[in-house]
C-alpha cells in the first residue's frame, strides 16, 4: 500500500499484493526470468542453476498468502500466563512474629528433610502402596483436594473437630497424609499442580492441620531453581498465610506457628526475602 497526497488530501492507493509483498520483503537474490527449454519438468530434480531457481519461484508462488495454524484448544495448558505479584506479606501482629533464631532453625531442619527425601526417594518410590491408596491424575484438581484433605472437609468447607464414628481410620473421609511412599511418586509437574490446587483451596478457606502437612511436604519436594509457576505459587501461599494470621485472635493459637513456618520457608529458604517476617 502506497500513500499519495493530492490537493492537500491524503489518499491511500492500493497496489497489487505481489508488489506489496515485494516492498515488505525485497529479494535478496534478484532472479531474471529464466529462458528454459520446453522440456523443463519442475517435478524432477533440477539439472542447472536456472532450473533450480525457477523451481523455487514456482514453489513460492504456490504457497498461500496467509497460513492459519490449526490449534486444538483442549491441548493448551490451563493458565499459561504467570502473573507474579511483587507485593509483600501482611506484617505480623505484635507478638506473633517468630524470632530470627527460630526461623534459622526451621530453615536448617527443612533443608535436612529435603536432603533425606531426595536421598531415599528411589527406595520409597519402590514401596507398594496400600490397596486403599489411589493417587489421582495430575490434572484432577478435585481429586487431589479430596485425596489430601478428605472428602468431608472438601464437601463441608469448614473445619470441625474430628469424630471417631468407626474404630478404623477412613482416609477417604479425612484425607491421606503425605507419606514418603506417596510424595516420592510425584514428579515436579504433579508437585506444582497439587501445590496450586491446595493454594486455591486455601485462598477461600481457613488453615487446617491437614493442609499444613501437605503444603510442608510439597515444599520439601519442590526443586530449585524454581520455575516461574512455582515461584508465583509460593509467594501467593506466603501472602495468604500472612492474611489468615491477621484474623487469628490469639498468638497462642496453634495455627500461628504453622503459618509462621510456611512464611519462613518461602521467604528464607526459597529466597523470597521481601516476604520475610521481621524478627520479634
Curated annotation (Swiss-Prot):
Any one Gene Ontology BP term: RNA splicing, via transesterification reactions
Location of the region described as May play a minor inhibitory role in snRNA binding to 5Sm (SNRPD1, SNRPD2, SNRPE, SNRPF and SNRPG) during snRNP assembly by inserting into the RNA binding pocket of 5Sm in the Swiss-Prot/TrEMBL record: 1-39
Predominant location: nucleus
InterPro entries: GEMIN2, Gemin2/Brr1
Family matches, as Pfam families: SIP1 (PF04938)
Residues modified as Phosphoserine: 81, 166
Locations listed in the record: Nucleus, Gem; Cytoplasm
GO CC terms of this entry: cytosol; Gemini of Cajal bodies; nuclear body; nucleolus; nucleoplasm; nucleus; SMN complex; SMN-Sm protein complex
Keyword vocabulary terms for this entry: Cytoplasm, mRNA processing, mRNA splicing, Nucleus, Phosphoprotein
Keyword Phosphoprotein applies: yes
Assembly: Monomer. Part of the core SMN complex that contains SMN1, GEMIN2/SIP1, DDX20/GEMIN3, GEMIN4, GEMIN5, GEMIN6, GEMIN7, GEMIN8 and STRAP/UNRIP. Part of the SMN-Sm complex that contains SMN1, GEMIN2/SIP1, DDX20/GEMIN3, GEMIN4, GEMIN5, GEMIN6, GEMIN7, GEMIN8, STRAP/UNRIP and the Sm proteins SNRPB, SNRPD1, SNRPD2, SNRPD3, SNRPE, SNRPF and SNRPG. Interacts with GEMIN5; the interaction is direct. Interacts (via C-terminus) with SMN1; the interaction is direct. Interacts with SNRPD1; the interaction is direct. Interacts with SNRPD2; the interaction is direct.
Function according to Swiss-Prot or TrEMBL: The SMN complex catalyzes the assembly of small nuclear ribonucleoproteins (snRNPs), the building blocks of the spliceosome, and thereby plays an important role in the splicing of cellular pre-mRNAs. Most spliceosomal snRNPs contain a common set of Sm proteins SNRPB, SNRPD1, SNRPD2, SNRPD3, SNRPE, SNRPF and SNRPG that assemble in a heptameric protein ring on the Sm site of the small nuclear RNA to form the core snRNP (Sm core).
Family recorded in the similarity comment: Belongs to the gemin-2 family.
Protein known as: Gem-associated protein 2
Name of the gene: GEMIN2
Amino acid at each position: 500500500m502506497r500513500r499519495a497526497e493530492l490537493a492537500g488530501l491524503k489518499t491511500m492507493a492500493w497496489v497489487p499484493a505481489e508488489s506489496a509483498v515485494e516492498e515488505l520483503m525485497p529479494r535478496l537474490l534478484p532472479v531474471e526470468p529464466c529462458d528454459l527449454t520446453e522440456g523443463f519438468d519442475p517435478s524432477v530434480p533440477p539439472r542447472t542453476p536456472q532450473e533450480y531457481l525457477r523451481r523455487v519461484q514456482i514453489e513460492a508462488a504456490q504457497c498461500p498468502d496467509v497460513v492459519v495454524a490449526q490449534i486444538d484448544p483442549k491441548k493448551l495448558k490451563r493458565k499459561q500466563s504467570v502473573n507474579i505479584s511483587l507485593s509483600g506479606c501482611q506484617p505480623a501482629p505484635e507478638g506473633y512474629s517468630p524470632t530470627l533464631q527460630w526461623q534459622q532453625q526451621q530453615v536448617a531442619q527443612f533443608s535436612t528433610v529435603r536432603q533425606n527425601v531426595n536421598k531415599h526417594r528411589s527406595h520409597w518410590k519402590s514401596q507398594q502402596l496400600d490397596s486403599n491408596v489411589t493417587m489421582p491424575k495430575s490434572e484432577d484438581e478435585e481429586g487431589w483436594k479430596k485425596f489430601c484433605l478428605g472428602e468431608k472437609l472438601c464437601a463441608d468447607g469448614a473445619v470441625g473437630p474430628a469424630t471417631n464414628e468407626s474404630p478404623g481410620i477412613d482416609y477417604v473421609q479425612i484425607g491421606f497424609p503425605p507419606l514418603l511412599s506417596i510424595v516420592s511418586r510425584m514428579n515436579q509437574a504433579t508437585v506444582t499442580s497439587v501445590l496450586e490446587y491446595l493454594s486455591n483451596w486455601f485462598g477461600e478457606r481457613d488453615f487446617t492441620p491437614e493442609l499444613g502437612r501437605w503444603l510442608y511436604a510439597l515444599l520439601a519436594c519442590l526443586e530449585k531453581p524454581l520455575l516461574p509457576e512455582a515461584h508465583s505459587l509460593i509467594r501467593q501461599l506466603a501472602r495468604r498465610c500472612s492474611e489468615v494470621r491477621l484474623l487469628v485472635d490469639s498468638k497462642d493459637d496453634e495455627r500461628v506457628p504453622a503459618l509462621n513456618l510456611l512464611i519462613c520457608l518461602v521467604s528464607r529458604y526459597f529466597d523470597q526475602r521481601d516476604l520475610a517476617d521481621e524478627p520479634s
